[in-house]
């Protein structure tokens, strides 16, 4: 399995990653709640009352039915409708006054904020805050995914390192077995000394013990990876290291891509939006209240009267201006300064994150370039050690070299081969680290 395949299974099965998706959904529902603030609000009331007229002391029965419906528009204006029915029945009344009297009123009113609340600043900022909450949840989720991916890189590379040591030890065992078999055949002819056989056997037993210890380490690492991937504990695991280590972009392009992916940069963007939101709200709070209110309606009045019944109706309407001012603005000024300081801090952190990203990318690229050079050197070292061992084996077969030297040369070749493999693995680690910085790993690994 490649690193991407391992990470995909970890992502699909890791419990805490599912929790981050729940957090994002909760934040998204906040946007729905904010949007509902523009919905219609319905209020109604009904009541009866027996009282005494404050003017003439006449017992009076009153029935009242009232209903109104209103909503705030996205512009900040408020539209409302009202309907009202009143029935008044007094024990006595003046001539000409209807008794009982029934009055009705239906109307519409419209409130237009001219300063504080204009453009519905509060709602707009609440909407932005909801969007910011979603962005924050997504940034937190991205950060968790990157942390898991970084942990999987370490686990995968550690497992690959153990695997490389196992393969290297197996090759060394095969060479020791060939040398032992050769010396046993020579001993059968009486031309090999006992010390040669003892030396080769000792080397072989040492390699076999080393392989046993490495196999124990591999089993523990395999179980750990299988647990993360949600696989059976005893499931077989074959690792396949990436062979394509090409970069293909310059540092500036990489920095731009890393900036777009960076969870830290996303969090700072969220903080900037929060600061801007707080600034707008603080500025709006400092404004005077100046509202223009229109109303229009239709009223009727009817009832029994002497000498004739009453039935009147009239179209009514009006306009008024409402004004209000806070006399102590120090609290609003403090809020405004806090928002400005919050934004300044976010800007400074943004500069630091960009600087860290640039240095991280430059550092990884330098490590990759140095790693490529080191890998090339190790490849040449392996070729030299192999040639040296081949020449020593030929001399050994002609009796011109001893067993000590052959064992030494085999150990040196095994060390060179292991160093080459380990350097290749470390180079792979740097490549995966760079791909994670750039966010490229998530183009292959799918996230729900």
Language model regions located:
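Bacterial Sec-pathway N-terminal export signals of envelope proteins
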Residues: 1-64, 112-125, 129-131, 233-273, ...
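Sec/SRP-type N-terminal targeting helices
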Residues: 18-22, 35, 74-101, 114-140, ...
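Amphipathic alpha-helical coiled-coil segments
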Residues: 19-34, 144-167, 178, 185, ...
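Small/polar, glycine/serine/threonine/aspartate-rich low-complexity segments that form flexible
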Residues: 46-112, 239-248, 279-280, 284, ...
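Periplasmic alpha-helical coiled-coil/stalk elements that build and connect Gram-negative outer-membrane
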Residues: 132, 138-257, 367, 412-413, ...
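Short helix-capping/hinge motifs at transmembrane helix termini and TM-loop junctions
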Residues: 190, 230, 399, 439-440
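Metallo-beta-lactamase
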Residues: 214, 263, 423
């Amino acid at each position: 399995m490649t690193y991407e395949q391992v990470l995909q299974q970890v992502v699909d099965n890791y419990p805490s990653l599912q929790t981050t998706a729940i957090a994002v959904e909760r934040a998204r529902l906040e946007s729905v709640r904010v949007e509902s603030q523009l919905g219609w609000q319905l209020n109604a009331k009904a009541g009866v009352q027996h009282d005494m007229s404050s003017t003439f002391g006449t017992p009076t029965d009153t029935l009242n039915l009232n209903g109104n419906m209103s909503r705030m528009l996205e512009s900040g204006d408020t539209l409302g409708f009202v309907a009202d029915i009143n029935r008044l029945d007094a024990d006595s009344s003046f001539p000409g006054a209807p008794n009982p009297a029934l009055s009705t009123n239906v109307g519409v009113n419209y409130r237009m904020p001219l300063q504080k609340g204009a453009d519905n600043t509060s709602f707009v900022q609440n909407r932005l805050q909801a969007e910011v909450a979603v962005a924050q949840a997504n940034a937190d989720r991205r950060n968790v995914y990157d942390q898991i991916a970084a942990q999987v890189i370490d686990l995968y590379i550690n497992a690959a390192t153990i695997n490389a040591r196992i393969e290297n030890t197996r090759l060394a065992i095969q060479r020791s077995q060939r040398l032992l078999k050769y010396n046993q055949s020579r001993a059968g002819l009486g031309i090999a000394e006992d010390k040669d056989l003892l030396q080769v056997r000792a080397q072989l037993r040492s390699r076999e013990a080393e392989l046993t210890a490495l196999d124990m380490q591999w089993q523990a690492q395999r179980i750990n990876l299988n647990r993360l991937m949600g696989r059976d504990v005893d499931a077989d695991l074959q690792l396949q290291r990436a062979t394509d280590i090409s970069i293909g972009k310059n540092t500036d392009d990489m920095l731009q891509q890393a900036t777009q992916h960076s969870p830290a940069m996303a969090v700072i963007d969220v903080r900037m939006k929060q600061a801007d939101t707080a600034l707008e709200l603080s500025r709006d709070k400092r404004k005077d209240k100046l509202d223009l209110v229109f109303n229009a309606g239709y009223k009727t009045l009817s009832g029994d009267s002497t000498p004739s019944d009453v039935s009147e109706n009239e179209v009514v309407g009006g306009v008024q201006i409402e004004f209000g001012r806070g006399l102590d603005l120090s609290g609003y000024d403090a809020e405004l300064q806090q928002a400005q300081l919050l934004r300044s801090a976010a800007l400074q952190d943004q500069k630091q994150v960009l600087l860290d990203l640039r240095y991280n990318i430059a550092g990884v690229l330098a490590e990759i370039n140095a790693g490529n050079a080191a890998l090339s050197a190790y490849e040449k070292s392996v070729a030299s050690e192999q040639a040296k061992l081949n020449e020593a084996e030929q001399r050994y077969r002609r009796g011109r070299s001893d067993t000590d030297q052959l064992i030494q040369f085999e150990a040196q070749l095994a060390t060179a081969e292991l160093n080459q493999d380990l350097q290749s693995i470390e180079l792979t680690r740097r490549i995966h680290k760079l791909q994670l910085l750039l966010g490229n790993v998530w183009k292959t690994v799918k996230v729900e």
